[in-house]
């Protein structure tokens, strides 16, 4: 690493000339910022709503302790021990696992292909409420509930706000570890917690809010009895997405962590803070849904945008203030996570340059990475999140490209009850048949929509590849390697290099050897069967 060149004024470097955080507080704020993101404030509440409330929370907490903490410690250890980003780090530990490093770079790339789009949407919503506070209506719709559907089908607006959000990310990453990432997170994370508390207190005093708390915290394990694997895979996917595990982010941030800092203590704080924010977000969304939406908590990803917008609209003028605070904190959470993922991609090229004796080129590669991801964001911007007119998905969806969207109904003599039939127009658009009003026509060719939940739009496609398959696969292989190949002593040695005694060696050894690999194998099985079964 002797070729590293300090490009940014004020950038902190370690003894090996690698950039580092200026303080442990800076590292913690950045790592918590990476972990706390849309996964907490968008994913956690809607997945809890769709998975039975308390049952989901219970499984999530167990996984966070038995799997999340172990994987977090493992990734931070690999990063600090090697002082390198994922590809170079895994190659240094064992060339056989170099593919793991490449996967750890591919995952954040895939995640950013939809994460940047959602981040841009959050910015637009925050601006809408900010201007509404001062009496300016920038929603441009007669009924505020119509804005979501209008916005996601406006490709130009989606691209514009995505581009703005990406530009902010590129600026922060180009500024460097200490001058960009650390400075933002030191301000952003405390601000996020303050805004969370303000909105929580306001929602808590609304009539009906108590029912939302009962849904979250009232003992109910019936969903586990009905479909345990479904709840398990949903909670596991959420945990990895929320904690930024399996994305290379914690390996990259760990490589910037100074030797005197405690890996275990930092890992525990990160997991606790991340889980706390997720629960706090649930304490906003769930009670609000019961107070203003009659307890409708399972509206999926639209919960963050459509449902919460309706909630704030019903609050009257104060809803503009609460709406701005809510989407401002979501913005902070989103950008602190997204630039950590862009940093993974950027550091891959920076480390490669340094190893070849070249200047790091951080600014150039941060901008280049942002531009490349932007190109792959375009399908997500343009497909209306699957809300087009082509049988529920726009032309050009993954299902269309893969030839998995439409199939002829075959030789049928009548409409089957409970089945949706479509006819193909001359323009190539499939229209749903109103079987209650239209008589069966034997001369007509009817089609069935065979698209899956993971290929009906680009967001779900990117999510399936990253969160659904690669993240649990990466955690499973990494845990297996630590437990059986590199051994727990590698983790203990690196953690104790800071002068802090490693606690729970036997517990973590069992986690790495058995609990995490076996648990992730079950999750992978559940994910793959749900996607392709």
Which role fits each region the language model picked out?
Residues 3-42, 71-76, 80-92, 98-99, ...:
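Membrane-interface "cap" regions at the ends of multi-pass membrane proteins
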Residues 15-21, 182, 186-339, 350-368:
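Membrane-embedded translocation segments of transport machinery
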Residues 346, 353, 357-370, 406-410, ...:
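C-terminal membrane-solvent junction of multi-pass transporters and transport-like membrane proteins
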């Amino acid at each position: 690493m002797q070729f590293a060149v300090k490009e940014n004024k004020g950038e902190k470097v370690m003894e090996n000339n690698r950039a580092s955080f200026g303080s442990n507080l800076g590292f913690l704020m950045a790592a918590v910022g990476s972990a706390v993101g849309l996964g907490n404030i968008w994913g956690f509440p809607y997945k809890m709503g769709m998975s039975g409330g308390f049952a989901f929370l219970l499984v999530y907490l167990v996984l966070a302790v038995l799997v999340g903490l172990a994987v977090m410690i493992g990734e931070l250890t690999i990063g600090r021990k090697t002082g390198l980003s994922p590809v170079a780090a895994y190659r240094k530990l064992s060339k056989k696992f170099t593919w793991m490093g490449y996967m750890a770079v591919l995952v954040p790339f895939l995640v950013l292909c939809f994460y940047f789009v959602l981040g841009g949407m959050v910015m637009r919503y925050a601006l809408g409420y900010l201007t509404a506070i001062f009496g300016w209506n920038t929603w441009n719709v007669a009924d505020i509930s119509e804005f979501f559907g209008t916005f996601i089908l406006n490709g130009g607006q989606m691209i514009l706000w995505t581009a703005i959000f990406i530009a902010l990310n590129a600026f922060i990453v180009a500024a460097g570890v200490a001058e960009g990432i650390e400075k933002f997170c030191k301000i952003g994370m405390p601000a996020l917690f303050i805004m969370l508390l303000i909105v929580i207190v306001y929602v808590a005093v609304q009539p009906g809010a108590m029912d939302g708390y009962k849904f979250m915290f009232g003992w109910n394990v019936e969903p586990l009895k009905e479909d345990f694997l479904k709840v398990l895979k949903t909670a596991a996917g959420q945990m990895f997405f929320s904690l930024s595990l399996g994305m290379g982010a914690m390996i990259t941030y760990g490589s910037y962590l100074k030797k005197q800092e405690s890996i275990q203590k930092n890992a525990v704080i990160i997991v606790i803070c991340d889980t706390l924010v997720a629960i706090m977000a649930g304490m906003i969304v769930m009670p609000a849904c019961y107070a203003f939406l009659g307890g409708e908590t399972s509206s999926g990803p639209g919960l963050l945008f459509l449902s919460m917008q309706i909630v704030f609209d019903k609050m009257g003028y104060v809803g503009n203030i609460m709406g701005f605070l809510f989407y401002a904190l979501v913005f902070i959470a989103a950008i602190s996570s997204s630039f950590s993922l862009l940093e993974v991609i950027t550091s891959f090229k920076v480390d490669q340059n340094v190893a070849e004796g070249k200047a790091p080129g951080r600014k150039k590669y941060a901008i280049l990475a942002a531009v490349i991801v932007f190109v792959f964001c375009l399908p997500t911007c343009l497909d209306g999140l699957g809300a087009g007119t082509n049988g529920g998905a726009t032309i050009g969806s993954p299902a269309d490209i893969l030839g998995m969207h439409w199939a002829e109904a075959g030789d049928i003599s009548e409409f089957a009850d409970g089945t949706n039939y479509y006819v193909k127009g001359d323009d190539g658009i499939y229209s749903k048949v109103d079987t209650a009003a239209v008589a069966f026509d034997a001369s007509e060719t009817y089609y069935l929509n065979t698209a899956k939940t993971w290929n009906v739009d680009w967001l779900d496609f990117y999510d399936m590849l990253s969160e659904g398959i690669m993240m649990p696969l990466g955690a499973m292989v990494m845990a297996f390697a630590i437990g059986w190949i590199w051994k727990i002593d590698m983790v203990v040695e690196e953690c104790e290099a800071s002068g802090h005694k490693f606690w729970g060696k036997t517990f973590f050894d069992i986690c790495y050897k058995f609990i995490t690999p076996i648990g992730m194998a079950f999750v992978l099985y559940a994910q793959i069967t749900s996607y392709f079964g």
